[in-house]
Design a protein with these regions (language model features):
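Eukaryotic low-complexity, mixed-charge intrinsically disordered interaction/regulatory segments enriched
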Residues: 1-31
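Intrinsically disordered, low-complexity serine/proline/glycine/threonine-rich regulatory regions
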Residues: 80-83, 99, 480, 508
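N-terminal domain-start segments of secreted/luminal proteins
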Residues: 67-74, 88, 95-146
Length: 509
């Protein structure tokens, strides 16, 4: 609420609505004219006399205000009055009269669990004081909202609830540290956890970070189409506090989320543990960016069978492990449903030789997967490491790897593995498999990405090669996939703008 001011009939004023909605603006000004101080009454009358009844700000990022069909002289007078009259009215009537500055951009502290439908509104900041559970309710987060996590905090959306974090290209939802810019670091807070009712292959599955006797951490079921909600145009920064020794939360955790969950245009930046981890489920990911994760960038376990298109992993030189780490089930490698995700149009960048060297893809414990139209670039250890039983997975078509560009990997730049004798995969030879002519993979020494990919503050992920020079596979015919993406990597070489523009960010701290 806004403090009472010099106009008793105006309890509070919403600035965005005032600018966007002429009827609302007129109502506020009429109340000020009727009940305000003489000075404010005069200001209200003057602005009403010059107001042409049009919105003063677009209602959405896609809407453009149309110019009023007036003469140039009248238009100059109208905009002059906006500058000289409307702004003081907003500044005086809204800020002085109603204490508006305490309303817009106010900080709302959250400590209690959410058990009824709740909206976190644009123009506000919300601070998580501890681990907040959403149970049996929908939490809606409007575009432009910033959620700051204090040490030890996290947002856990249980399987009985849904999260609708719908940002926009120009107003993303941002989950970040509560510390001031310049003082933020990995692990400042926990992260975002979504739990659902889709199949997992682990009995009595429960999420890490929730006490064993707390049933709110349970997830999984039989509903392959279950929805955990929508996370769209959203950034998650500086997450991953240590729950207990060597066990941290991920930036984004998806446990048993089904195919009706929408995870699209999401960046996870500088997480202390994994960027995104799936525990079973059938959730799909699209337009995903993971930058500077301190462990794996994308991790999966317990039977995840989702699809991914347009994903970028940028691993920083000083931290991180694998770009992808895929497991099925450590207790039973053949557990069903088997982990078998599908990837198209992915860029993995490993930063080359550095203090912390990386591996692009590690598959183990029975995980299958399908990897196509990928650029795997600058991994000092190796591009692919398979462990445990692999030959059977390839034979049953549960593991495929084709039409990929492998560039500048290994010690000499042209290897896909470190040393075949070191692999615990019962003699499966990744090198020979990848180089099989029928798979149409390309292995080259020189990098396949532009030099700016090395930047940690303003990276670009456009490939060097043209579309014509690429050997790509057409994505499957399905509503989820963009079938026109006949190129390798997550960024169209021909595009002048990309899906990364406007909403992503790369703060160091």
């Amino acid at each position: 609420r806004i403090d009472k001011g010099q106009c008793p009939s105006v309890d509070f004023v919403h600035l965005n609505v005032l600018l966007r909605e002429p009827n609302y603006r007129n109502d506020v000004l009429m109340r000020v004219e009727a009940n305000g101080t003489p000075e404010l009454q005069a200001l209200a009358r003057e602005i009403m006399a010059n107001d042409d009844g049009r919105p003063l700000m677009a209602k959405s990022s896609n809407q453009k205000l149309q110019a009023s069909p007036v003469t140039p002289q009248k238009r100059r007078g109208w905009f002059a009055r906006h500058a000289l009259v409307l702004v003081p009215v907003i500044g005086t009537v809204v800020a002085t009269v109603a204490g508006f500055t305490a309303f817009e951009n106010r900080n709302v502290r959250i400590s209690a669990d959410i058990t009824a439908d709740t909206v976190w509104e644009s123009g506000h900041r919300y601070t998580l004081e501890n681990t907040v559970f959403v149970e049996g309710a929908n939490l809606t987060i409007e575009p432009g909202v910033t959620i700051e996590g204090e040490p030890g905090s996290a947002l856990v959306v249980t399987s009985s609830a849904k999260l609708f974090a719908r940002g926009s290209r120009n107003q993303p939802v941002v989950f970040t540290s509560s510390k001031e810019p310049g003082a933020r670091a990995r692990g400042d807070w926990g992260g975002v956890v979504l739990l659902g009712k889709a199949p997992v292959n682990e009995p009595n599955a429960r999420i890490e970070g929730v006490p064993e006797n707390d049933t709110r951490g349970q997830f999984g079921g039989s509903d392959t189409q279950h929805s955990c909600g929508v996370v769209q145009y959203t950034r998650i920064e500086f997450a991953g506090f240590e729950v207990y020794q060597n066990n941290e939360l991920n930036g984004l955790t998806l446990g048993g989320c089904g195919s009706n969950t929408i995870i699209q245009n999401v960046q996870v930046h500088r997480a202390l543990d994994d960027g995104i981890e799936m525990f079973g489920g059938t959730v799909d990911l699209k337009n995903i960016l993971v930058t500077g994760a301190a462990d794996d960038s994308i991790d999966w376990d317990w039977g995840w069978r989702g699809r991914v298109q347009f994903a970028i992993i940028q691993q920083y030189r000083d931290v991180g492990d694998n770009a992808f780490e895929g497991d099925n089930n450590g207790s039973s490698h053949s557990a069903v449903p088997r982990s078998e995700p599908t990837f198209y149009n992915v860029t993995l960048y490993g930063s080359g030789r550095s203090a912390k060297e990386h591996r692009a893809i590690m598959l183990r414990e029975g995980s299958g997967g399908h990897f196509h139209n990928m650029i795997i670039d600058s991994y000092a250890i190796e591009a692919l490491d398979t462990r445990d039983e692999v030959t059977a997975l390839v034979g049953m078509n549960a593991l495929t790897f084709s039409h990929n560009l492998l560039a500048n990997n290994g010690r000499l730049g042209n290897l896909t593995i470190v040393n075949e004798t070191d692999d615990d995969d019962f003699g499966f030879n990744e090198e020979l498999w990848i180089r099989s002519p029928e798979l149409q993979n390309t292995v080259q020494v020189e990098t396949g990405l532009q030099p700016s990919v090395t930047s940690e503050s303003s990276p670009h992920f456009r490939p060097r090669s043209s579309v014509r020079a690429m050997t790509a596979k057409r994505p499957p015919k399905a509503e989820f996939f963009d079938e026109s993406a006949m190129y390798q990597g997550a960024v169209n070489p021909r595009a002048t703008s990309t899906w990364l523009d406007d909403w992503t960010a790369f703060p160091e701290s």
